[in-house]
């Protein structure tokens, strides 16, 4: 798998935008997901040897047997797997696995030249280390195979780091057979959060779970060391089929010592047979086929989703067949991960795209199109689509309006456009959508027409489509307008979002996204939408409804979220625990208190599992703070800063905790420490300004609050607070001018409009005050 989870973003996306979004500290979520995990479910394999063939292995229980035990019987499947990217997801660095040029090859980036060479049969790179000095590092493992290969370097604390200089393994005629940097348009040097020695490129957390089988991270917070282990170094048979020891015993003995259920399962932990006995038939000769039996489970899709989804791990020990949301928390269709219409933007790894699709809604599974053992398509070109969609109807110029043998005649050219990640890795969008240049013209979303016709604009493309079909394009995904309205804080955004959330005909992942996009102030209609979401049979919708309640009044949170403390899925239980962490015990019934304590223990365990990350420590610190445990909260937030001094939310949250504790002088010190690390971080300057206000140092506060607006002019909240500070110091004209300027960019910002009404009223200008009061009234009613 060339998909490297150490990069959770498109290298070509603007660094400043994504960095800012990652560092928003209010209600910290790690990589747009809660980071978690908890108690350990120990599994291993028949051979208890701790080391074999140089691989670090788990040797705890008799369950994982290794792919070699499988391919001895399943030769056809094994042969396909041996040639797959799953097989080559990770390997020990040797003459067979290493594809890159290590014959004293040189590569220069950011003014520094790295040299790739061999010594005593081993592979090395001389490159910039975390201290900025050129150092020799041994390449320990290869990572991926095509279209690029990365290399892992092991440090003394057993931390593996992914080098940001990768090998382009494509043929030379395609531009390959060269070294290249994954961030070619940026200047990533030591100290940068994206430097290869930093947490963002750490294999143990960012990559390992998807590139090896049955991974155990084994981080020790007391020593800040790892002892990461796996059952198999790459993605083996058991990564998808589950531990195979019982199946091996069954196959060898044919006299099963199992229960009746185990006999019927042949000792397998999961049966991936959802397509068995299923036929796709056409109700009429020219119609699309219909599945003979509705898809009855998500087993296959969830097995793929463990890696082919943008998600955070909330528990360790996933084995195929267990509920996905017991172990992972997936990202929804939010910006900047997706465009407003749901098209992929950042690296989202397929699952979130596919769940939006009409194919998924009609029962298609991953293996309908992909051979699960080779990873290849079941047919090439339009022939794959023609297994369901009539070629005579769709593979014709009357449908696609392009030359029959041209690139535009390919089904995927229009319905699965590519986005290139990691510089050279194009990946197709699996939302399988109808091109919508009309949406592009109105909302700024991309479309596949202009992906090829780059010399034309979206309105031209929309006109062409209308001429071809006599109408605007019509797609299955209908939520773009609502999500775009939410981004723009449009007056009707909330109503549009509620409509999407309530429409069972929309994809569940879109309905879930609509719920989390509902923003404060949460009126009765929004709370009703969330209450309905909490009762929804779809788990993603329930989880999103909980997330959306973070801005609800305490009484509403308790009333609505308490029943979810006993949900069947762990991701939902711990979200409910986090949401209700600050509820006083005397407000809870005995049953609620018991459920909250149990779910809170799961939440704490989930963050403890990720104690190697500053994000996990901040999450835990905030949780303790809401529970009233200030001592442990301070400890965790300080630990986060020590673990990763570049993680800005740790400073902001610790300072905010000191505010709650009445220790603003200490908060000021923390914020100034953070500003030394990130002098251009607007959040820290804004927080420092507020701290100085509380410390009665108004002039100093005004400097910091203004600095925040300069560093982040697009943040309406910063402008609003700065204007309030100006007004409080008697600078009414300057305050009003600042607010009016911000209102031009954010015409529907309630705080700005309300402040203008208030400021004009305070100076006796009733006409202007009424104008803005009426505007606010209209906006609120909408």
Feature map (PLM): residue ranges:
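Primarily the internal scaffold of c-type cytochrome electron-transfer domains
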Residues: 4, 47-53, 61, 76-144, ...
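Amphipathic alpha-helical scaffolding segments comprising HEAT/armadillo-like alpha-solenoid repeats
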Residues: 491-501, 523-535, 553-564, 587-604, ...
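Short coil turns that connect the paired helices of HEAT/ARM alpha-solenoid repeats
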Residues: 502-506, 534-540, 565-571, 609-611
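Helix-start (N-cap) detector for alpha-helical repeat units in TPR-like alpha-solenoids
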Residues: 508, 539-542, 570, 614-615, ...
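Structural marker of alpha-solenoid helical repeat scaffolds
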Residues: 521, 536, 552, 567, ...
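Structural signature of tandem alpha-helical TPR/SEL1-like repeats
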Residues: 524-525, 556-558, 592-604, 627-639, ...
């Amino acid at each position: 798998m060339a998909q490297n989870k150490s990069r959770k973003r498109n290298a070509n996306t603007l660094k400043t935008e994504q960095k800012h979004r990652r560092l928003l500290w209010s209600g910290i979520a790690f990589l747009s997901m809660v980071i978690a995990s908890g108690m350990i479910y120990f599994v291993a394999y028949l051979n208890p040897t701790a080391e074999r063939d140089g691989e670090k292995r788990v040797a705890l229980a008799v369950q994982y047997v290794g792919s070699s035990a499988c391919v001895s019987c399943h030769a056809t499947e094994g042969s396909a797997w041996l040639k797959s990217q799953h097989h080559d997801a990770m390997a020990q660095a040797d003459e067979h696995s290493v594809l890159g040029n290590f014959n004293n090859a040189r590569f220069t980036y950011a003014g520094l030249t790295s040299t790739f060479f061999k010594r005593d049969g081993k592979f090395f790179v001389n490159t910039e280390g975390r201290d900025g000095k050129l150092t020799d590092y041994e390449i320990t493992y290869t990572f991926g195979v095509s279209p690029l290969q990365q290399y892992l370097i092991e440090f003394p604390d057993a931390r593996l780091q992914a080098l940001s200089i990768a090998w382009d393994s494509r043929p030379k005629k395609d531009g390959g057979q060269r070294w290249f940097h994954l961030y070619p348009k940026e200047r990533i040097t030591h100290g940068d959060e994206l430097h290869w020695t930093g947490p963002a490129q750490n294999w143990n957390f960012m990559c390992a779970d998807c590139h090896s089988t049955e991974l155990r991270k084994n981080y020790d917070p007391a020593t800040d060391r790892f002892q990461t282990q796996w059952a198999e170094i790459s993605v083996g048979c058991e990564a998808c089929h589950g531990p195979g020891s019982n199946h091996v015993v069954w196959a060898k003995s044919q006299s099963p010592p199992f229960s009746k259920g185990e006999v019927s399962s042949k000792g397998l932990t999961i049966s991936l047979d959802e397509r068995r006995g299923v036929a796709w038939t056409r109700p009429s000769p020219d119609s699309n086929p219909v599945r003979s039996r509705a898809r009855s489970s998500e087993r296959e899709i969830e097995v793929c989703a463990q890696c082919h989804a943008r998600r955070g791990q909330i528990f360790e020990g996933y084995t195929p067949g267990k509920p996905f949301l017991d172990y992972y928390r997936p990202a929804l269709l939010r910006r900047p991960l997706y465009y407003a219409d749901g098209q992929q933007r950042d690296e989202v790894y397929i699952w979130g795209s596919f769940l939006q699709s009409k194919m998924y809604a009609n029962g298609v599974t991953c293996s309908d199109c992909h051979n699960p053992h080779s990873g290849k398509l079941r047919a090439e070109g339009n022939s794959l689509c023609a297994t369901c969609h009539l070629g005579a109807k769709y593979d014709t110029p009357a449908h696609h309006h392009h030359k029959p043998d041209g690139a535009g005649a390919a089904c995927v050219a229009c319905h699965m456009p590519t986005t290139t990640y990691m510089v050279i890795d194009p990946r197709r969008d699996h939302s399988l959508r109808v091109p919508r240049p009309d949406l592009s013209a109105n909302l700024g979303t991309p479309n596949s027409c202009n992906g090829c016709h780059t010399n034309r604009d979206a309105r031209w493309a929309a006109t062409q489509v209308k001429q071809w079909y006599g109408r605007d394009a019509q797609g299955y995904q209908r939520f773009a307008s609502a999500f775009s309205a939410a981004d723009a804080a449009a007056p009707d955004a909330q109503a549009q979002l509620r409509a999407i959330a309530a429409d069972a005909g929309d994809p569940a992942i879109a309905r879930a996204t609509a719920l989390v996009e509902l923003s404060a102030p949460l009126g009765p209609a929004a709370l009703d939408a969330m209450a309905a979401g909490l009762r929804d049979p779809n788990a993603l919708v329930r989880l999103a409804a909980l997330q959306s309640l973070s801005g609800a009044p305490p009484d509403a949170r308790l009333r609505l979220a308490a029943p979810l403390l006993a949900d069947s899925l762990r991701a939902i239980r711990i979200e409910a625990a986090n949401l209700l962490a600050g509820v006083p015990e005397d407000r809870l019934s005995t049953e609620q208190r018991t459920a909250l304590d149990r779910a809170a223990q799961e939440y704490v365990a989930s963050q403890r599992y990720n104690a190697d990350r500053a994000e996990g420590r901040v999450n835990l610190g905030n949780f303790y703070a809401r529970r009233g445990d200030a001592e442990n909260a301070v400890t965790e937030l300080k630990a986060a800063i020590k673990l990763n001094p570049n993680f800005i939310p740790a400073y902001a949250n610790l300072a905010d905790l000191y505010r709650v504790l009445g220790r603003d002088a200490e908060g000021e010190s923390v914020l100034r420490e953070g500003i030394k690390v990130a002098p251009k971080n607007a959040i820290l300057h804004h927080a420092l300004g507020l701290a100085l206000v509380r410390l009665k140092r108004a002039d100093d506060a005004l400097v910091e609050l203004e600095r925040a607006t300069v560093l982040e002019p697009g943040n309406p909240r910063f402008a609003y607070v700065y204007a309030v500070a100006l007004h409080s110091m008697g600078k009414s004209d300057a305050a009003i001018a600042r607010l009016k300027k911000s209102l031009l960019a954010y015409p529907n910002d309630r705080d700005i409009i309300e402040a203008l009404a208030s400021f004009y009223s305070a100076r006796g200008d009733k006409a202007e005050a009424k104008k803005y009061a009426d505007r606010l009234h209209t906006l609120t009613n909408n």
